[in-house]
Amino acid sequence: MEEMEALVGVVPHSADCDLFKEPVRKRRRLHRDRQFQAFPSAEQSALKEYEKLECRTRRVLSNTYQKLIQSVFLDDSIPSGLKYLINRLLALIEKSPLEPVYVGFLGITGAGKSSLINALIRQAMFLPVSGESVCTSCIVQVSSGCCEQYEAKIHLLSDQEWKAELKDLTKLLHRAEQSGEEEADLWDRDDATEEAAQKLRMLYGHGAERRHYEELLRLKPRGRIPNSRTITLKAEEAGELSVKLDPYIRTRRRDWDGESAETQIWPLIKYVEVILPKSALIPEGVVLVDIPGTGDFNSKRDKMWKKTIDKCSVIWVISDIERVSGGKTHEDLLSESIKACQRGFCRDIALVVTKTDKLHLQEYLRERKMGNQAIQSQREAVLQRNEIIKLQRKRMLKEKLKRKLPADSKVLEASDLVYTVSAHEYWQRTILTEEESEIPKLREYIRKRILDKKRRLVTKYVTEAFGLLLLTDTLNTEESLLTEELNTGGLRQFVEEKMELLEKAIEQCFARMEQPLQTGVQVAMTSYRRILGSCLVRSRGNQGFHQTLKAVCLKNGVYASRTLARIDLNEALSQPIYDQIDPVFGGIFRDGKPTAPALMQHIDAFKHSLEERMAEVGVRSGWKQDGYKRSFLIQEISAILGGLESHILRRKRKIYKSVTSSIQNDLKPCYEEAAQITGKKACERMKDVIRRGVERQVAEGLFERAQERMWHQFRQLKHGITEKVKGSITTMLTLAAPQGVGLCKELADVRNEQKEMEKLYRSLREVAENAQLRRSMQDFLLRMSPSKAGPHGTKL
C-alpha cells in the first residue's frame, strides 16, 4: 500500500501536450503554429504532424497511467510486472519532447562569432562584437523559447569557486621580495599576470593586485552580487535587453575608468543564457553557443569550456578570412573540435570563414596574376576567392579528419565542410546578395538537423509507447507468451549463450586498442623530452613566460586564457598515445556504416539474434494471427538495448580522457613543488623541477600506468554493458511469463487506449511518406527556379 501511495503521489507532467481543456488546446495550437515558424511550409507541415503524433501518444500514456494507478490503488502489494509498466509509463510521459541541439561557435577573439550569431538571429549588434578594446568574456548560450519577452540569466561562480580562484590569482601575482631586477621586468611583462591583475582591479578596485589573499577576502566587491548567484534580465525588445546585457558579457582588454557596476563583476560570471521569444529564424530546440578563447584560468570555467564543447552535436570552427591559413590558436581549436568527435557528442564539424567581403580588388588580381581577365567586379572576385578557399580548406580539413577518425565517419560524408560567410554583407548587401552571404545556408543546415532529430525521436517514442500498451495485454492474462519456451528453459539458455558471445565480441572489439595503445606508449617514451622542451623553451627566452609557467603549475599543468594560446603539458605528453589510438578509438565508438566493426554493431547483432528467435517462437506458438505479442517482445528488446547508446556515449568521454587524466594525476606533486618556487631564477628552477619530476615519473611507469587506466575504463564499460543487458533481458522474460491468478481481473480496461495507440503506431509510416513527398516537391520546385549566377572560373 505504501509503494502504491508513492506512485500515486507522482503526477505525470505531459510536457507540451496538456490537451484536456479547450482553452489549453487553443493555446497549444497557437504555440505549435509559432513554434515552427522558422521552417518553410513543407517542413512546417511535417513537424506539425510529428508534434501531433507525439502529443496524442503522450495523452494516451497519461490516460493509461491514471487508469492503472486507480485499478490497484487499494492493493497491499503491486506485482513486479505492473510496477515495471507503471514506472515505464511515467518515464515516457515525462520524457523531454526534444533534446536540445547544441551548435558550438569555437574561435579566437575577433574571429566573428558574435557577429555571426547576430546575423543568424537577425538582430544586429544584439551580442557585443569584439573590437580593439572589448571582447566577449564568457560562454553565451542563445536559444528561442515559449516566453513572450527577451530574457537573460547571468550565472555567477559560487562563493567557494571564487575563493579558490582568488587564492590562485594572488599566488600568481605574489612577487618574491628578493627578486632581482631582471625577474621583476619579466614579471611586469607577463600576459598571464596582467590578466590576473585586471580581474582583481575590476572586482576590487585599483591596487587590488598588490593585496594578499586574506586582505581581499575582507574587501567587498564593487558590484552587487545576489545571494542566488544568478542575475535575471528581461526586456520587451531585443535592443533593450542587449543594452542591459552588454556590460555583463563584454570586457575591455585594458583597464578603463568609469566601468559600470555590472561590468565590474565580469570575473565572477560563469556563463550566460539568453532566451529569445519564438523566432522565425532559429527553431526551438536549437542552442547557439558562443565559446570564446581557449579556456579559462578558473578551474570551474575551464571544465565548463571543455564540457560545453563536448556536448555540442555540431561544432563550427570560426576563423576570419585573414587568419584562415594559419595561427597556432586556430589550429589548436580545430584539433579540439576533432577531439570532441572522439570523446563527446559531436557528429558534424565545419570550418566557417567569416568577413569574406574584405578584399582589395587590385591586390587580389595582381596576386592571382589575372590582369584584366574575367574578373570585372568586387563581387566576382569575392565569390571566386570563396570557392578557392572552400576547395583548399575542405581538402585540409578532410586530411586532418582522416588522420584522426575512421574512413567511414559520417562527418567526412558531409556535403559542406567549409562555409564562407559575411555577416556585414548579410546586412548591407552592397557586394553580395543575402544568399551569397551564406547566412541562410547555415540556417537551413540547422533546420534540417532539428527536423531529422524530431523525426527520429518521435518515431522511437511512438514505437516504445506502443510496446508498453501491448504489455498491458500480457499482464492482463494468466497465460504466458512464452510458456513452453520458458518452462523448458530453451529461451533462457539461448539468451545466456548469446550473452556469452556478446561479451566475447565486446572483448575482441576492445582488443583492437591493444596494439596502437602499446605503440603509443613506446612513442611517448621516446619523445617526451622533445615535447617537454618545446613546451618549456620559448624563442624569446623567459621574457613574458615567468608567471605564465607559474600559472601552468598552479593549475596542474594547464594554463587557459580568454585571449592567449592554451598550454596543457599533460595533453602534450599524452599526444603521441592519442596519435596512435585515435583512428581505432573512433572506429570502436563510430556511428557510421552499419557493417563497420563498431561496438554498437555487436550490440545490434545481439538484438537481431534475439528478435529472430522471438519470431521463431511466435511461429511455433501460433502467433501468426496475433503479431502484437511478438511486437511487444521485440520492441522491449529494442528499448532495452537502445538505452545502452547514451550510457556508452557518457562512458566514452571518461575512457578517452583517462590517459591525460592519469598523467596529470601522477605529475601533480611536481607541479605543486614548482608552483612554490619564488626568488631569483625562479623560471629556470621551475622548469628544472618539472623536468626532473617528469623524468622520475617516466622511469616509474608514467605512460604504462596511463595505458592500464585506460584499459580499466574499457573493462568497466564492458562490465556495465553486460550487467545492464542481463538484468533488463531477465526482467523482460519475467514479464513474458504467466502473471498469476487474480491480477487480470484487477487491472483497468485500457482497450480503447490500446486501439488508439495502434492507430498512432500505424500512422508513423504515413507521416514519414507525407514528409518525403513534400521534400521531393520542394526540391523539384527549387530545381525549376532560375539559378543564381556563380563566380567565374576558379583557379587554384
From Swiss-Prot:
Its EC number is 3.6.1.-. It comes from the Eukaryota. The keyword Signal does not apply. GO terms for biological process: DNA damage response; somatic hypermutation of immunoglobulin genes. Transmembrane segments: none annotated. SUPFAM superfamilies: P-loop containing nucleoside triphosphate hydrolases (SSF52540). InterPro entries: Dynamin_N, Nuclear_GTPase_SLIP-GC, P-loop_NTPase. GTP binds at G107, I108, T109, G110, A111, G112, K113, S114. Residues 158-185, 742-776 form a coiled coil. It is found in: Nucleus speckle. Nuclear GTPase found in germinal center B-cells, where it may inhibit function of the activation-induced cytidine deaminase AICDA. Reduces somatic hypermutation in B-cells which may enhance genome stability. This is Nuclear GTPase SLIP-GC. It comes from Mus musculus (Mouse).
